[in-house]
Amino acid sequence: MNKYFDLSGQVAVVTGASTGLGLQMAKAFASQGANLVLLARREQRLKENAEALTKEFGVEVMALKCDITHTDEVKGAVEAVLKRFGRVDILVNNAGTGAIGNAEDITDEQFMHEVNVDLFGTFICAREFGRAMLDAGYGRIINIASMYGLVGNMIAGSAPYHAAKGGVVNLTRALAAEWGKHGITVNSICPGYIYTELTTATLDSDYFQDMAKRSIPLGRYGREGELDTCALFLASPMSTYVNGQNIAVDGGFTCV
């Protein structure tokens, strides 16, 4: 455990925690002593993750099946968390999706689904868990946006994703401005391409390896743990004066 990132006794809620970046961040929080609440739609995988995290780190882990686009389910999750732990200190809005296609081919349904999950779902969770934080006078909200919420992308058509993640970037600023006086900080992480169990095969392909060398100043994609440390920083006492920021963790992709 790192004394600077110590989260002992705190309760961290992570959405989209069944796989990928959500699970990586949950592990990072657990390694620093935080009790966890894992939210996702894949109930069996959540239960398996909860058991593994409890065994490895000795923290309490609560697994809740939840669709973040349904307000009643999120409200139920908040009630369950408060009943068990009595507090919510950290919320990581990680759940999301990705519609890929040229703008002229995207349907209304595809566009609205993207916005519904990535933007509206993030707002629902921030609002509902934020109420508990407002009551407590303390909270750390970390929204997972994307580097494509900051810049456009000529490589692959994904206008709905860009629009939704750009919305998350500005939602972060708005909530930070509104809730800062109540002891709540709201920041976002804007990841580039990061290795996870879901992305490894794609990122290791010749096409993506060549793209990394051409487009990313560091010449590679993010490794496991390189996003987690940013999340830990934003959740920890080390970031008490950091609010309303959108931090790109992208190897420099957005600076060129």
Report the location of each language-model feature:
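Short C-terminal tail/terminal secondary-structure segment
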Residues: 2-4, 231-232, 243-256
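Conserved glycine-rich cofactor-binding loop
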Residues: 11, 18-20
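Short, small/polar-rich loop/turn modules that mediate ligand/substrate recognition or access, typified
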Residues: 92, 180, 185, 242-244
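Substrate-binding pocket helix/loop in short-chain dehydrogenase/reductase
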Residues: 102-103, 107-115, 208, 212
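Active-site helix of classical SDR
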Residues: 126, 164, 172
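Alpha-helical segment proximal to the catalytic Tyr-Lys
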Residues: 131, 177-181, 240
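Residue(s) in the substrate-gating loop at a strand-loop-helix junction
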Residues: 146
